[in-house]
Curated annotation (Swiss-Prot):
UniProt cross-references to Pfam families, sorted A to Z: Pribosyl_synth, Pribosyltran_N
PANTHER family: RIBOSE-PHOSPHATE DIPHOSPHOKINASE FAMILY MEMBER, RIBOSE-PHOSPHATE PYROPHOSPHOKINASE 1, CHLOROPLASTIC
Organism: Haemophilus ducreyi (strain 35000HP / ATCC 700724)
HAMAP family: RibP_PPkinase_B
Protein name (database record): Ribose-phosphate pyrophosphokinase
Keyword hit for Transferase: yes
Length: 316
């Protein structure tokens, strides 16, 4: 194995620690802090000349601080003559701003971030469940987008008390993801929630395509933000006779009123991964369970360093 160096910012310290343990490689010695005026301070405290360096840093909230930490760390390592620098970004912030809506005068911020990372000296990006896969094309360097679904599916398969389970897509846009999950769950049945607003200033109506009566529903998505739409979906499923509702998502964004929304009894359990640390408020709910992606990300790092196939990790 080449000389691998692992470094971590302040966004996901526990995930970084787990990855380092899986690889039997200690995290690199670096100072990542703040100057008295709030500017980011980075210093690499060990030799990285010619090394294959991986920086583990989600760009979750505080998004701008974590993104800037990553960028400054890349620059510090580049100036220290690192051989190759891979940004391991388990959760890629700004991924939802991936296109202009109609003729709106808005930026494509995902492209801005991609340009920023490329220009500062990142040689490769490893990320997980991009909100829009086309973001890979925004970069001028290779991007490996791995999937959290195998970890989520393995957990679902361990639920021995599921009654007549059915996979549910929370919207039309998530049908491909839900279908893939349903296929891996022994071709489980699937339902779709079709959200429509009949006319302006009228509440959104949720139509459920599929029979969920007396069934355990498994809602799958790439991320949960405020959880408002998720709760409405769970309520609609319960109103249609669903027995229980479980929500599975890779990224636990959990912003704004998420804690209040997730406390809604319509949701029986929420299962996420550790790409984003949970706040104390969310942990106090005792309804949210976290799975780790450390083994998968560690294996991806090993394969990248050894020039092995990443896609082979997900071959059926």
């Amino acid at each position: 194995m080449p000389d691998i160096k692992l470094f971590a910012g302040n966004a996901t310290p526990e995930l970084a620690k787990r990855i380092s343990e899986r690889l039997y490689i200690s995290l690199g010695n670096a100072t990542v802090g703040r100057f008295s005026d709030g500017e980011i301070q980075v210093q690499i405290n060990e030799n990285v000349r010619g090394s294959d360096v991986f920086i583990i840093q989600s760009t979750c909230a505080p998004t701008n601080d974590n993104l800037m930490e990553l960028i400054v760390m890349v620059d510090a390592l580049r100036r220290a003559s690192a051989g190759r620098i891979t940004a391991v970004i388990p959760y890629f912030g700004y991924s939802r701003q991936d296109r202009r809506v109609r003729s709106a005068r808005v930026p494509i911020t995902a492209k801005v971030v991609a340009d920023f990372l490329s220009s500062v000296g990142v040689d490769r990006v490893l990320t997980c469940d991009l909100h829009a896969e086309q973001i890979q094309g925004f970069f001028d360097v290779p991007v490996d987008n791995v999937f959290g679904s195998p970890v989520l599916i393995d957990d679902i398969l361990k639920k021995k008390d599921l009654v007549n389970p059915i996979v549910v897509s929370p919207d039309i846009g998530g049908v491909v993801r839900a279908r893939a999950v349903a296929k891996l769950l022994n071709d489980t049945d699937m339902a779709i929630i079709d959200k429509r607003r009949p006319k302006a200033n009228v509440s959104q109506v949720m139509h459920i395509i599929g029979d969920v009566t007396d069934r355990d529903c498994i809602l799958v998505d790439d991320m949960i933000d405020t959880g408002g739409t998720l709760v409405k979906a769970a309520e609609a499923l319960k109103e249609r006779g669903a027995r229980r509702v479980f929500a599975y998502a890779t990224h636990a964004v959990f912003s704004g009123s998420a804690a209040n929304n997730l406390a809604n009894p319509a949701l029986d359990e929420v299962v996420v991964t550790d790409t984003i640390p949970l706040s104390d408020e969310i942990e106090a709910l005792n309804k949210v369970r976290v799975l780790t992606l450390s083994s998968m990300l560690a294996e991806a790092i090993r394969r990248i360093s050894n020039e092995e196939s990443i896609s082979a990790m997900f071959d059926a």
